[in-house]
Amino acid sequence: MKEARLSRLVACASTVAVLALASGCTMLSVDKRSFYQYDHPSAVEDGSFRRSLDAFGNTMVGGNRVEILNNGDAIFPAMTGAIRDAKVTVNLESYIFKDDKAGAIFADALMAAARRGVEVRVMVDATGSSRSGALLDRMRKAGVKAYVFHPIRLWSLYKIGRRTHRKILVVDGNVSFAGGFCIANQWMGDARNPKEWRDMMVRATGPVSAQMQAIFGEDWTYTTGEILAGDKFYPHIEPAGEILGQGIKVSRGDSSSLAAMFYFVAIESARKSIHIQNAYFVPDAQIRAALIRAAKRGVDVRVMVPGRHIDMPLLRMASRLHYGELLKAGVRILEYNRTMMHNKNAVVDGLFSTVGSINFDARSLLQNNEDSLSFYDRDFGARMEATFAEDEKHCREVTYASWSRRGIEQRIAELLSSFLQPLY
């Protein structure tokens, strides 16, 4: 059986990992952090909750217009269209930028912008875009400033765990995109079949784009030394709408795990509903405890994760290990089975929403550089809820009874996968 073979593979891989850890040869380190204590959390509807969000690095700013972009058929034209309309600057950061049809579409738009005099900067990750050197060279020849974050070299292998998982596009300093979308063929289409992945981006127009520009600038300056400042990067931005928005920056140097703390506070503040969509859902003990407490106080907690089409089956097994305690508490777990679901978004009490690159796993919460755009708006929250409800039509709900019927081999594989998941 395929599952049995996978289980044996996990067992072998676990042995290798344990030996590597024992000999001090592991290439990843997970920073120690405190167990959170958050007494008397404000409800999401309270103004104090919104003001408390400012503690996560950026102040909530108004005057934004936000569009939800579902799947490649909406995302590709929106992002490449913004690049084509650029007049001054284009700054793009992507974990994956493949040298394939999708990559060519973006590269053509970026090169055309550079040729007409727009300053174009591209930052890709060395691991996620490891085979894109020729494509980057073509862009450089056209005038694009293209760099690789943390190139993998023999003498710096100890840094291999430091990755940028961010997905950011900022155009002319006032239009920004964030979400789970990467530049590769599987993100094309409309999630109609397993070859077309399900994903979401948001396009924000307005003052919050300056915060996303600064997040891009952090990795750019770290890699190139160039400081992005002045009017061409931070122009005066007129209000484009009424939505309150906030750019969330997560960096490896953040030993308290801003990403985990951000979600922890939102979960503890929920009074009505928590609807999460996440591609790699392996939350730590305190996030699980927060979700359990929310469900027990009557909050409608639903977590949507990939089903059988997940691209990383070991992560799915690690995720399923902890389903039992969540299901017993009343958390509903929905497996999306139409195709691979790559979303990283949530909406709390229909009012607070977030869309970005952050997964619920150890790498996102402790290792990677990540980003998210968060919004505090009832109408936008309703749009997020509608999107969640539409995706629910393609899900199978996991019950405690079905979860309990797992065989011993699968249970062992899940346990071993959980030990390995920080390395994925």
Regions found by a protein language model. Name each.
Residues 24-424:
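Charged, low-complexity intrinsically disordered terminal segments
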Residues 12-22:
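Bacterial N-terminal signal peptides
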Residues 2-14:
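Bacterial N-terminal signal peptides that target proteins for export
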Residues 1-2, 27:
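Basic/polar N-terminal segments that are highly enriched at the extreme N-terminus
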